[in-house]
From Swiss-Prot:
InterPro entries: Pept_tRNA_hydro, Pept_tRNA_hydro_CS, Pept_tRNA_hydro_sf. Its main location: cytoplasm. It catalyses: an N-acyl-L-alpha-aminoacyl-tRNA + H2O = an N-acyl-L-amino acid + a tRNA + H(+). It is an enzyme of class 3 (hydrolase). Transmembrane segments: none annotated. The lineage of its organism: Bacteria, Pseudomonadati, Pseudomonadota, Alphaproteobacteria, Hyphomicrobiales. The active site is at H19. Its EC number is 3.1.1.29. This is Peptidyl-tRNA hydrolase.
């Protein structure tokens, strides 16, 4: 069994924020893969289903970003899951817009959602890091992640979500590098990434 966590803040005013791309991915994942309706539990919302023959629970913490770890800990404890069974999808300012990286463990790059999860369950869970770009100065980061994606960004955001959802079976199967490559190829094919460095076109 796998626990797939999408990070974000609850409420309509945060719905389109860069910080909420984890929620966006899970919403589309549940829709496309025919998961159960969302229900409230583990201090969040969950949907149950399967991807590639593997049982998967999707979790959107409703604790607000800074306390995401409480919901993850509750779910992991209930299902008796270890860190290798947990994958967290989140925005990443240290990556250019439209770039994706998968890694296990490592630093949190100032992400408060990851900080909370690491404090509650440990650090060695898988992260799907979705680049949203850096605003250029530290004092601008808060406003950057809590603002909606610009209209000009929406096409790549939609393409990114579609590619992640389409190739989710590879992620669930632990084939991280293949998953990462498939997502980047999908974005390149639509003209959103430069072929050389993977930055947004």
């Amino acid at each position: 069994m796998r626990l797939l966590v999408g990070l974000g803040n609850p409420g309509a005013k945060y719905q389109g924020n860069r910080h909420n791309i984890g929620f966006m991915v899970l919403d589309e994942m549940a829709r496309r893969h025919g998961f159960s309706p969302w229900r409230r539990r583990f201090q969040g919302e969950t949907a149950d289903g399967s991807i590639g023959g593997e049982r998967v629970t999707l979790l959107k913490p409703l604790t607000y970003m800074n306390d995401s770890g409480r919901a993850v800990q509750d779910a992991a404890s209930f299902f008796k899951l270890g860190l290798p069974d947990i994958t967290v999808v989140h925005d990443e300012i240290e990556l250019p817009a439209a770039k994706l990286r998968v890694k296990v463990g490592g630093g949190i790059a100032g992400h408060n959602g990851l900080r909370s999860i690491s404090a509650h369950v440990g650090n060695d869970y898988r992260r799907v890091r979705i680049g949203v770009g850096h605003p250029g100065a530290k004092e601008l980061v808060h406003g950057h992640v809590l603002n909606d994606f610009a209209k000009s960004e929406r096409p790549w955001v939609e393409a990114m979500i579609e590619a992640i959802v389409e190739h989710a079976g590879l992620l669930v199967d632990g084939r991280d590098s293949t998953f990462q490559n498939k997502v980047h190829l999908a974005l390149q094919a639509k003209g959103f990434l430069d072929n050389n460095d993977g930055s947004a076109a």
